[in-house]
């Protein structure tokens, strides 16, 4: 059904949601902290979309972020790192809030750190936006990411939903993999 990013954008458009696809820099860039480059990119993108909401004919108070796997980590990062830009202001766009109004994470990766704890770069607070997580139990590498993040959201009083499926593994996008997965239906419900 949906695996490529442009297909996900098309699915969102069919729901009446304007989708913006961000191609971000990979985390490891010489001279930058591990997660700094992609966080800069998503902060700038959300600020840009919000600053240009009128021209894009969208509601600036309904800008969300969605990510799959490592993109889920990036979406969670911007959901918790929005008070201060991670780069010097370029123009007026960087004075506009880069806080997403909601967050959808599909089989997010890297949300847990060592010793079964939430990754240190994720400082969940009551200001973290409402979040929906979609995860398969048989995703052995990253199921803890969703579980730890979900509990952190709940502890902070953030509205959070988690759809946990028994099968699906990792990397299925929104396609029907032959398993009992209704990811797009769950996401439709959450959006």
Which positions does each model-derived feature cover?
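Catalytic nucleophile-loop/oxyanion-hole region of alpha/beta-hydrolase
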Residues: 24-56, 178
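Conserved small/polar residues in nucleotide/adenosyl-binding loops
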Residues: 1-5, 182-187
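Short beta-strand/loop motif that positions the catalytic acidic residue
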Residues: 133-135
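Conserved alpha/beta-hydrolase "acid-adjacent" motif
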Residues: 140-145
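Short amphipathic alpha-helix adjacent to the substrate-entry channel of hydrolases
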Residues: 4-20
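Short, proline-enriched alpha-helix->beta-strand connector loops that line the catalytic pocket
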Residues: 97-101, 126-131
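Primarily recognizes the serine-hydrolase "nucleophile elbow" in alpha/beta-hydrolase
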Residues: 44-120
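Catalytic histidine neighborhood in serine/cysteine hydrolases
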Residues: 154-171
């Amino acid at each position: 059904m949906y695996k490529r990013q442009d297909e996900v954008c098309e699915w969102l458009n069919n729901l009446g949601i304007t989708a913006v696809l961000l191609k971000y820099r990979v985390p490891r860039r010489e001279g930058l902290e591990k997660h700094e480059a992609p966080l800069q990119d998503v902060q700038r993108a959300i600020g840009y979309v919000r600053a240009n909401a009128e021209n894009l004919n969208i509601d600036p108070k309904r800008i969300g972020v969605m990510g799959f796997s490592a993109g889920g980590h990036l979406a969670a990062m911007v959901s918790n790192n929005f008070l201060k830009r991670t780069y010097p202001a370029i123009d007026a766009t960087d004075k506009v809030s880069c806080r997403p109004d909601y967050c959808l994470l599909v089989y997010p990766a890297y949300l847990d750190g060592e010793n079964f704890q939430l990754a240190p770069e994720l400082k969940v607070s009551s200001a973290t936006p409402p979040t929906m997580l979609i995860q398969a139990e048989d995703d052995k590498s990253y199921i803890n990411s969703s579980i730890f993040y979900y509990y952190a959201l709940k502890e902070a009083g953030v509205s959070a939903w988690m759809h946990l499926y028994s099968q699906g593994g990792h990397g299925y996008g929104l396609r029907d993999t032959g398993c009992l997965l209704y990811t797009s239906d769950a996401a439709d419900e959450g959006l």
